[in-house]
UniProtKB/Swiss-Prot annotation:
Its biological purpose: Responsible for the release of ribosomes from messenger RNA at the termination of protein biosynthesis. May increase the efficiency of translation by recycling ribosomes from one round of translation to another.
GO MF: ribosomal large subunit binding
Family according to the record: Belongs to the RRF family.
Protein name according to UniProt: Ribosome-recycling factor
Lineage: Bacteria, Pseudomonadati, Coprothermobacterota, Coprothermobacteria, Coprothermobacterales
One cellular component term from this protein's GO annotations in UniProt: cytoplasm
Length: 186
C-alpha cells in the first residue's frame, strides 16, 4: 500500500532534522580536525561580515593542522583576529601568505566533553522528531474528527508515522554513535 501524503511530508521534516543535527556534529572536532570546524567563523573585513569560506580556502594539512589560504593576503590580519575571537581551540600563525592552525591533541577530559556535546545534539534532535511526529499525528486525528479520514485510514497513517519516526531516530543514533567513536579514538 502506498504511503500517505502526510507521512511523506513528515519524512521530509524528519530528514531536515537529521540534516540540521549532522551540520551541528560537523562542527564538533574529533581526533582528525576538519575544515567544517571553522564553518561558524565570521570575519569582519572592510566594515562587512563574511563567512570564512567566502574569503579563503580552508584545507586540512594533516590530522591536527588546518591551512587557511585567503583569496587576498591583505585579509590575513582580519581573519586571524576572527579566529582568535571564535576560540576554535588553536592559535593562528601566518607566514604572510596563509594562516596555519595547529590543534593540540585532545585530552581524555576534552574527548568526554565533546561526546557529551554529541549526546546533547542527539537529544535536541530527538525532541524535534517527537514534536514533528506529534504535530502530524494531531493533524491526522483532526482530519479523522472532521470525517476527512476513516478510523482505519487514520490508524494506518499513525502507524506509518510511528514507523518513520523509529527509522529516523535509529539513523540519528547511528550517526551520533559514529561521531562518538571518532571522538574517542586516539
Amino acid at each position: 500500500m502506498k504511503e500517505h501524503e502526510i507521512t511523506r511530508q513528515a519524512r521530509e521534516h524528519f530528514q531536515k532534522t537529521i540534516n540540521t543535527m549532522s551540520d551541528q556534529l560537523s562542527t564538533v572536532r574529533a581526533s582528525r580536525v576538519s575544515p567544517a570546524i571553522l564553518e561558524p567563523v565570521t570575519v569582519e573585513y572592510e566594515g562587512a561580515k563574511y563567512k570564512l569560506s567566502e574569503l579563503a580556502m580552508v584545507v586540512a594539512q594533516d590530522a591536527r593542522t588546518l591551512i587557511i589560504e585567503p583569496w587576498d593576503v591583505s585579509m590575513i590580519p582580519a581573519i586571524s583576529r576572527s579566529l582568535q575571537k571564535a576560540n576554535v581551540g588553536a592559535n593562528p600563525s601566518d607566514d604572510g601568505k596563509r594562516i596555519k592552525l595547529v590543534f593540540p591533541s585532545l585530552s581524555q577530559e576534552r574527548r568526554e566533553e565533546l561526546a557529551r556535546l554529541v549526546d546533547k545534539y542527539l537529544e535536541e534532535a530527538r525532541i524535534a522528531l517527537r514534536n514533528i511526529r506529534r504535530e502530524y499525528i494531531d493533524e491526522v486525528k483532526s482530519k479523522e474528527k472532521k470525517k476527512e479520514l476513516s478510523e482505519d485510514e487514520s490508524r494506518r497513517i499513525q502507524n506509518e508515522l510511528q514507523k518513520a519516526f523509529e527509522e529516523y531516530e535509529k539513523q540519528m543514533e547511528q550517526i551520533c554513535q559514529r561521531k562518538r567513536k571518532e571522538i574517542m579514538e586516539e
